[in-house]
């Protein structure tokens, strides 16, 4: 297991991860399209993938050899935890071909304790990624032996989500010797570079690569702003 961990972490530390998660129920939300996104991402230079859902993971796995971070998202009635909340999710992700399994690592009410999920994932021979929202959560998981600490949920457990990524969070974790996966609002190449400069071992990029609806929305907003500015200048 030790050599497998080193091999996977070394691979991830060479670049960035493409999170191939289309908008739910959108026109791109089909396993065959997710697989195409994944293959195109690898051809473009991604050294890892983050894939949500068993059907999508099964569609992607035969076509790529790079490490895959697998997750299952659920909307629970009694918990705000969405990412891989159950033991059965962990087992299904392993069977579908995930190398790394990411879990919600926040200190919120949850159906299964973080410790149990971590233990199960590692017993199956997979690495764990802790999707954290705070330094305390990240360090708790680091103390459990979690291999990858992600900044994934920073800004998403509070009333207001910042526009910029959480660079201080990256720096704090890196200073403690964590393998840091920067994730969350890294929507430009420059921000991805700044994450590495802040101490991240790797960066996960999602919407800016694989969510066409979001990308078009960004351009739409800027073009509309430009039109308004032109009107002001004329006035």
From Swiss-Prot:
The keyword Isomerase applies. It comes from Aliivibrio fischeri (strain ATCC 700601 / ES114). This is Putative N-acetylmannosamine-6-phosphate 2-epimerase. Keywords: Carbohydrate metabolism, Isomerase. Its EC number is 5.1.3.9. It catalyses: an N-acyl-D-glucosamine 6-phosphate = an N-acyl-D-mannosamine 6-phosphate. Signal peptide: none annotated. Belongs to the NanE family. It holds the Pfam family NanE. Pathway: Amino-sugar metabolism; N-acetylneuraminate degradation; D-fructose 6-phosphate from N-acetylneuraminate: step 3/5. GO terms for molecular function: N-acylglucosamine-6-phosphate 2-epimerase activity. Converts N-acetylmannosamine-6-phosphate (ManNAc-6-P) to N-acetylglucosamine-6-phosphate (GlcNAc-6-P).
């Amino acid at each position: 297991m030790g050599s497998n961990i080193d091999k996977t972490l070394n691979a991830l530390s060479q670049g960035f991860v493409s999170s191939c998660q289309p908008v739910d129920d959108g026109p791109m939300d089909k396993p065959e399209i997710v697989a195409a996104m994944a293959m195109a991402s690898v051809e473009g230079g991604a050294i890892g993938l983050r894939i949500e859902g068993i059907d999508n993971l099964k569609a992607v796995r035969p076509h790529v050899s790079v490490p895959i971070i697998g997750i299952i998202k659920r909307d629970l009635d009694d918990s705000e935890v969405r990412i891989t909340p159950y033991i059965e999710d962990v087992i299904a992700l392993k069977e579908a071909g995930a190398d790394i399994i990411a879990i919600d690592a926040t200190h919120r009410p949850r159906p299964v304790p973080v410790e149990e999920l971590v233990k199960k994932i590692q017993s199956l021979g997979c690495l764990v990624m802790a999707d954290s929202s705070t330094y305390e959560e990240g360090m708790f998981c680091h103390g459990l032996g979690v291999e990858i600490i992600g900044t994934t949920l920073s800004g998403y457990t509070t009333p207001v989500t910042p526009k910029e990524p959480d660079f201080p969070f990256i720096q704090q974790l890196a200073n403690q010797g964590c393998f840091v996966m920067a994730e969350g609002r890294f929507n430009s190449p420059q921000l991805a570079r700044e994450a590495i400069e802040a101490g991240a071992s790797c960066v996960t990029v999602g919407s800016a690569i694989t969510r066409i609806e979001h990308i078009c929305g960004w351009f739409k907003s800027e073009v509309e702003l430009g039109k308004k500015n032109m009107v002001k200048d004329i006035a």
